[in-house]
């Protein structure tokens, strides 16, 4: 059997691995690269028509976003995923295709004036529909034979509704080898969904490492913090605008807001309106409601047993059409607006920012990771003005973050997951982490007695009776990056701050061996500065 690592190696998006075993070829995930890209993904080394199938760990676009392109290029195999993942991919791949078509149309309108050659979308809605027809839903904890000598099982990994680790049994020459692909390992105690299931045996493991170098810290009081933000904003007469990822995070926030209203934690504002202004989020919320209750955690199942919808609350309103979206800003009552995209790079959220950023009574609340170079990152780094739809907008609203919300396990969560295997796997392949994070986490596992490595894109490993042997090293072709257009002054200022911090570290190193009295005074001055600015 052979593993070829094609994407999300020494980076966190574009997950794709080719498994060739028992006479079959299967991709595990086929994701789109998003945000900052470090290394070029490698092309799939076989024609799409020669691939027998795909196993999708979950619905996020960085794990499934190239499935329509695969279908466009004559892939006709089955795509296996859990039933909730099949449902979520149905809406997310269509949405991704609409974005591809819109961006191509916009570039062509712009390019026509300059005589540029027309561009084609990466894929179309028709391609997405073709891919969606290839999906087959699989129940959790149910073994399925894909072909003689190839058996799979999906196990809940607690990252997103429908997310899974995938166990694969390969039988060749009378010997059975078990592989486990972790998928994205979930954080503990997330609302709605179950905690990750720990598997206990495998010969080889392919494991994510997103937060393999850090800890999340103590779990914040999300409901209390959110209630305080709502209270002070509504008391000022303002709106709370929340850029939110349509699938997963929006439903978590609805869960929190339902509890806030149920307990009366916001005083004096009755059943304040809560708008979901994202067609994708509205569809995702419907899928959450229609999903088998067994997919949810114990607390959510208890609510459902009492006839309580865990993501429904009085005052909840949905805006499907563009006209309905525009009408939200005509409503002067203090309200919550949940809209996509979560990093403010596209979608209806940009219109809500235009109408609310300049108002000091309003709050913009970020509830997820903001990648470098995005409008969301620019705002949380302290921009005083931004440009939206060609218009300069002064930032006068309160900018807040609800920290600690994460769908990914931290370092301790990852270690708990891998340490559940007994005996230890023969080798652990580290994927889905930033460049240095993968190296750090591989070393952490090595220090704990595992045999671990972090392959680069294009690496090939042959697994047989003699063990796992690397037959081709991955390539380290770095992607050239251009600075994003319209970057805010705040990004430049923040880089000055980062440079100053690096200089401080160099000065500290230069003082090694100095007099204790001087070093103590230096440390006191640094701590005083940190105390002043640590907010």
Q: Residues of each region from the PLM?
A:
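His/Asp/Glu-rich metal-coordinating catalytic cores
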Residues: 1-55, 60, 64, 69-252, ...
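A polyampholytic, Gly/Pro-enriched intrinsically disordered region
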Residues: 100-105, 292-305, 469-495
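Short, surface-exposed amphipathic charged segments that create phosphate/polyanion-binding patches used
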Residues: 150-154, 287-295, 415, 465-475
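A general structural motif
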Residues: 185, 218-223, 314-324, 343-345, ...
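Short, compositionally biased "basic patch" segments
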Residues: 191-206, 293-300, 370-396
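Hard-cation-handling environments
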Residues: 229-374, 387, 422, 437-439, ...
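Generic long, charged, amphipathic alpha-helical segments
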Residues: 387-418
């Amino acid at each position: 059997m052979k593993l070829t690592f094609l994407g999300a190696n020494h980076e966190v998006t574009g997950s794709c691995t080719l498994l060739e075993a028992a006479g079959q070829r299967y991709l595990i995930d086929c994701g789109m690269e998003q945000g900052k890209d470090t290394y070029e993904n490698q092309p799939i080394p076989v024609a799409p028509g020669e691939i027998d199938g795909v196993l999708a760990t979950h619905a996020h676009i960085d794990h499934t976003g190239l499935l329509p392109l695969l279908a466009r290029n004559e892939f006709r195999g089955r795509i296996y995923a859990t039933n909730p993942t099949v449902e979520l991919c149905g809406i997310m791949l269509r949405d991704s295709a609409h974005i591809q078509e819109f961006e191509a149309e916009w570039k062509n309108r712009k390019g026509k004036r300059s005589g540029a050659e027309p561009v084609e979308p990466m894929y179309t809605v028709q391609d997405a529909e073709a891919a969606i027809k290839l999906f087959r839903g699989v129940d959790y904890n149910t073994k399925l034979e894909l072909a003689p000598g190839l058996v799979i099982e999906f196990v809940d990994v607690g990252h997103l509704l429908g997310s899974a680790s995938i166990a694969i049994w390969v039988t060749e020459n009378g010997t059975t080898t078990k592989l486990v692909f972790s998928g994205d390992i979930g954080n503990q105690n997330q609302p709605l969904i179950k905690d990750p299931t720990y598997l206990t045996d495998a010969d080889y493991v392919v494991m994510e490492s997103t937060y393999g170098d850090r800890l999340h810290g103590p779990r914040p009081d999300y409901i209390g913090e959110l209630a305080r933000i709502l209270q002070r904003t509504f008391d000022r007469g303002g709106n709370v605008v929340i850029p939110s990822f349509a699938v997963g995070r929006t439903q978590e926030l609805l869960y929190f807001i339902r509890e806030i209203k149920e307990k009366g934690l916001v005083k004096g504002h009755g059943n304040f309106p809560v708008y979901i202004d994202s067609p994708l989020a509205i569809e995702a919320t419907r899928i959450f409601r229609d999903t088998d209750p067994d997919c949810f955690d114990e607390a959510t199942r208890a609510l459902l047993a009492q006839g309580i919808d865990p993501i429904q609350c009085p005052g909840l309103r949905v805006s499907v059409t563009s006209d309905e979206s525009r009408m939200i800003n005509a409503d002067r009552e203090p309200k919550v607006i949940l809209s996509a995209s979560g990093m403010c790079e596209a979608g209806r959220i940009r219109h809500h920012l235009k109408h609310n950023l300049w108002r000091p009574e309003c709050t913009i609340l970020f509830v997820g990771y903001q990648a470098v170079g995005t409008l969301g990152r620019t705002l949380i780094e302290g921009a005083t003005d931004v440009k939206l739809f060609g218009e300069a907008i002064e930032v006068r609203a309160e900018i807040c973050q609800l920290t600690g919300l994460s769908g990914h396990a931290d370092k301790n969560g990852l270690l708990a997951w891998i340490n559940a295997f007994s005996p230890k796997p023969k080798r652990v392949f580290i994927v889905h982490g930033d460049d240095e994070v993968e190296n750090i986490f591989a070393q952490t596992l090595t220090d704990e007695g595992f045999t671990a490595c972090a392959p680069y894109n294009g690496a090939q490993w042959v697994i047989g009776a003699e063990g796992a042997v690397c037959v081709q090293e991955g390539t380290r072709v770095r992607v050239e990056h251009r600075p994003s257009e319209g970057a805010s002054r705040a990004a430049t200022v923040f880089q000055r701050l980062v440079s100053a911090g690096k200089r401080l570290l160099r000065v500290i190193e230069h003082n090694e061996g100095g007099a204790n009295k001087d070093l103590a005074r230096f440390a006191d001055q640094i701590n005083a500065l940190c105390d002043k600015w640590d907010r």
